[in-house]
Amino acid sequence: ANIWTDVWVRWRGEGHGVRVGQYKQPMFLDELTSDRYTLFMEQGLPSSFALARRIGAEYSYATPHWRFSLSAYDGNLRGLQKGAGGVGRVVWTPWAQPGDLLHLALSAGSESPDGDIARFSSRVEQSGIGRTRLDTGVLTGVDRIRRTGLEALWIRGPFTAQGEYLRADLSRRNAGDAALGGWYAQLGWFVSGDHSSYKDGALEIPDLGEDGRAVEIAARISALDLDDGSVRGGDTRNYTLGANWYLGKHVRLAANYVHVDGERRGVDVQPDVL
């Protein structure tokens, strides 16, 4: 079970869909996009609040310009991220043509964490970099976590602009409520003239043309604030430059440079990570 990720069955018909099993919950565009197709090697800082994969049941309905999803969930197959909750997402695509698309979305959810505890952390958009970790530590007395997310995606020829805001409001007993949040904005450019692709409310494998090769450069700024009241997890703003070299549909070489401007409990953290 430790290696299982997406394990689900789904029925679809006339725009309606029902899915049962373990799947990515309908919140946070960067999470819903496969890591094979994301602009950067790691997700933006707001991913600290993402629900990721949970076991549950989802109903969805899609039209040419709208997509609605509603999901009820609990823990996952790894026995982590325990807590029952529900989340909904509404996506509007006023226009959606290959190489010319606008995606706007709103999501909201509520969760009752198992054992009334919660924890949020981040490794500054480069996995394995422990020394720059932001971490709230274990928060006790958490009755409920309410998440809210905003998404925007614009594809215009070789350019892709994407941004999200994600917020977590914690209702706590005897410790005071807390509001934590983060956002990012990023821009990608296919120097080779190719363009990003989109399907079912998320990014798909780029349109790489006949030879299947492409070069893309990208920039991102993102922020995360895990400080509010008695919660002192730190805050940071990151600046990232990236390059992707596609050698076909299944091979991508990527490099990212991240400058971190962070602080946690009075200690400044400003590393450069490659």
Regions found by a protein language model. Name each.
Residues 117-274:
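Outer-membrane beta-barrel pore domains
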